[in-house]
């Protein structure tokens, strides 16, 4: 089991939908989150992409220099970059980070944003372009290890004699992650990616997605790994966790929710449509209505695009829900919580000990290896409470 955290390059706060409780997302703050994830033993971090975010490649490059083992899941954007340039970027990042790159193939689903970036393709065309893009990217990096070149002629991508002179550390290329809920997305995942990602839907719906992608991959003689993107709200008791969930959306008003949902409704993303359906386009606002599956809460999606659900509960409950997804075949969990610095610590301290995952080697530290809290009376090292 791999557990990744999240770098909030589009903002961070104690509350959703308001400037109250917000904090400046400077590089110093992003560095705090990354270093925390690195030292706490997270396997990596997802860096988001889009016009609401800082550029993920620049941020990842800067954070790689201040971390030791943390891996970075960074977006490839077909149509916004060429596959050959993207291959060079990926190879260089992988080399300078000593093999710590993971790539996230992002087709995009916000038509207004895509047109603002100069991409005027419909849903089907975007997936065609993405399939051609990632094929060239993969083949080019694989060839780079033997100083080879490739040529490709497609509907959206054509290259002749393409080469990457400095190959990546990882062979044949850094692992490719990809998420999408349409049939076209499932076809692309089955044929070309290493890990298929889904947003946090109820387990029964996730199981159907996994079965479909597996069946499609089998037709190509391939196996695919699976991951899930979730928020987490974990506290020492269930009551405290649900109180924290209520507090997270306590500043929302009807107008703010309606504005956000109007934007989401214009997208042609099947995944976003499925997220919106979980809370009926923002009309479900009570805790009972937003708990769409045991301990799976859709409140985040009232105003946040993309991943809109959170696991809510005490440590044992949240760990049990994670294992429920793991039993379906999920082995990568990409998590986040508000605010991201504090919640990175909280989740690692409360839930990591309960998960069936290999504990990553700790970074070098003090001779007195913790965590043990503050030393008492100048020499007494605290131990776990027996109560």
UniProtKB/Swiss-Prot annotation:
InterPro entries linked: Alkanesulphonate_mOase_FMN-dep, Luciferase-like_dom, Luciferase-like_sf, SsuD_RutA_monooxygenase
Class of enzymatic activity (EC top level): oxidoreductase
SUPFAM superfamilies per record: Bacterial luciferase-like
Keyword Flavoprotein: yes
EC number: 1.14.14.5
Protein family: Belongs to the SsuD family.
UniProt GO BP: alkanesulfonate catabolic process
Lineage, highest ranks first: Bacteria, Pseudomonadati, Pseudomonadota, Betaproteobacteria, Burkholderiales
Keyword field contains Oxidoreductase: yes
Catalytic activity entry: an alkanesulfonate + FMNH2 + O2 = an aldehyde + FMN + sulfite + H2O + 2 H(+)
The organism's place on the tree of life at top rank: Bacteria
Role this protein plays: Catalyzes the desulfonation of aliphatic sulfonates.
Gene from which the chain derives: ssuD
Species of the source: Cupriavidus metallidurans (strain ATCC 43123 / DSM 2839 / NBRC 102507 / CH34) (Ralstonia metallidurans)
Keyword annotations from UniProtKB, A to Z: Flavoprotein, FMN, Monooxygenase, Oxidoreductase
CDD domains, per the entry: Alkanesulfonate_monoxygenase
GO molecular function, one term: alkanesulfonate monooxygenase activity
Short name of any one Pfam family annotated for the protein: Bac_luciferase
Signal peptide as annotated in the record: none
The protein's name in its UniProt record: Alkanesulfonate monooxygenase
